[in-house]
Amino acid sequence: LASDLNGGANGEDIEALLATNGLSDLLVEKTATIGEKLSVRRFAKVTGDAVASYIHGGGRIGVLVAADGASNDAIKEALTNVAMQIAAMSPEYLSKDCISDDELAKMKSITIDSSLNKPESLPKPILKNLFDKAVNDKLFSDEDLAAYEEQKNNKFLFNFLSDKAVETLVELAMASKADIVANKIFAGAVDGRMKKQLKEVCLLEQAFVRSDLYDGDVAGYIADVAKKLGASIKATGFIRYAKGEGIEKKEENYAEEIAKMTGNK
């Protein structure tokens, strides 16, 4: 990772990158040193008034993080702490504002379907309606019906139901999807799960891992540093690369390979 290379445009032109600052010669030199061919597979750039880098695990993970505002050693140290956060917590976005409406809609759709496929997690009034329909329409086996009647007040009820009974509840939930989604209790539960997911995937919303330095989220840590330094600091972007990321590994089926070699099928 390097923050002062000018070649290429947002990772699109590797040839232009290699022609910058003697990088091509450096690759040749390093190849001769270690005896293995080195090549640039991908790259990305971040820009800002201050840029900090962090390499973890001897090169297993590399991070660049940029911010606009002031630039000094204290700010770069703070950004290095943020880079360590990125290495450890693997955020996908800088903030919620960086997620498109289509992506948010997809996340919500997945969250809804995930909830419907786990009936035990549904709000009690909705789950009761599903059980009532399954019982009234005689959709349960005699064994599951008996288990339900005996254990319906047990919080571990689902431990006594068969997989088939759970599948039946899932089918009923999916069939009533529109009504369930319109339910205020369910909608509130979905919103809560969405907020939790966004805190996991958005850097600025994540809980700051260096709680010894600041107890709060990453955005709060940056604001706290800016206040103490009397400076303006606004995170503008980051890059996180992991070793082997994006490389597809060929899966070998040795049983099939041996069968081919011996003429067996």
Can you name each region flagged by the protein language model?
Residues L1-K265:
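N-terminal assembly/interaction segments in proteins that build large macromolecular machines
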